[in-house]
Amino acid sequence: AAIASIAVHELGHILFGRIVRRKADWLAIGPLIIYRDGKILFRWKHKYFGGAVFLYGEAITNKEAYRKEKIKAAVSLLGGPVTSFLSGFGFLYAGQNNEYAFYFGIFSILIGTGTLLFTDGLPAILIFTNSLYAYYYFLSVELMTSKEEKQFDFLLKELRGELQKVKADSIEKISLTCLGALYFYLYCSQINFNMTSREGVKIHQYILNEIKHKGLGIFKNKQKRSVLTAIVYLEEMNLLMEGNAEAAETLYAKLADADDRRLYELKRDA
C-alpha cells in the first residue's frame, strides 16, 4: 500500500504536468528509474524508499514565457499532493471494509500532507513570492533537462539582477538558496563562455574576499561549505581558462593558508 501510494503521488505530478503541457524526463520509484526514452535503471542511492519525477516545460526566453511557466510549474508541483488527497479520501470512503484500501488511503493522505507542507507546496509558493528562488529553480531545471539545446540567456540575465540585490555583511547571513543560485549562475555562464559576467556580481566578489581572509573551515554548515567550495572551484577554473594561472594559484594558496590557520586555532582552543 505504501509503495502504491508513492507511485500514485508521482503519477499525479505527471498527470497534472501533462495537462499544462510539461514533459516528464524520468520517474523514480524507490530504486527503479524509468527514463523518457524507455530506458530503465535499477539504482539504490538512499537509505529510504521514496519517489521523484523530473518535469520540464518550454524554454523561458522572455517575461511572458516566464509568467506562464510559473503557473505551469506550480500546477505540476501541486498535482502530486492533490492526487494523493483525492485517491486517499476516495479509497477510505469507497473501501471502508477493505484493509488494503484503508492503509492505501492513510498512506496517501500522509504523503499528500507531508509533500504539500515541505517538498511540493513550498517550492510552488516560493516560485511566486521569491524571484531569486524562481529564476534559480527554472535555471536548474533547464540545465538538467535532456534537451539538446538549452537556453539560459534570459534566465541568467534576470538571475544576475536578483543576485545584485542581495546584501549581507557576512557569508553566514547569506541564505543557502542565494549561494545555490550564485553557483548555478556562475556554472551556466561558464557553459556560455561568458566568464567575465561574474566580475560585476557584487555578492560573488564579497564571498571570494571573505573566503580568502577566513578560509572555508570557519563555516560549520556542511551544505553551505560544500556550495562555497564549488563556487571557489569554479572561480579557479575561470581564472585558468582566462590564462590567469598566477591568480588561480594565489587564490588556492590563500585558501590553504587560511584553512591551516583556522585548523591550528581549533586545535589550540581544544
Stretches with model-predicted labels:
Residues 1, 7, 92-102, 229, ...:
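Solvent-exposed, well-ordered amphipathic alpha-helical segments
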Residues 2-62:
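Small-residue-rich helix-interface/hinge motifs
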Residues 61-148:
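Hydrophobic transmembrane alpha-helical segments that form the core helix bundle
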Residues 72-75, 79-80, 84, 182-204:
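Structured, soluble extracytoplasmic/luminal domains of envelope-associated proteins
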Residues 95-98, 130, 161, 190, ...:
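Short, flexible coil/linker elements and helix-boundary hinge sites characteristic
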Residues 134-145, 172-193, 220-241, 262-270:
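Amphipathic alpha-helical repeat scaffolds of TPR domains
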Residues 140-177:
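Acidic, Ser/Thr-rich low-complexity segments on the non-lumenal side of membrane proteins
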Residues 153-167, 194-216, 243-258:
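Alpha-helical repeat scaffolds
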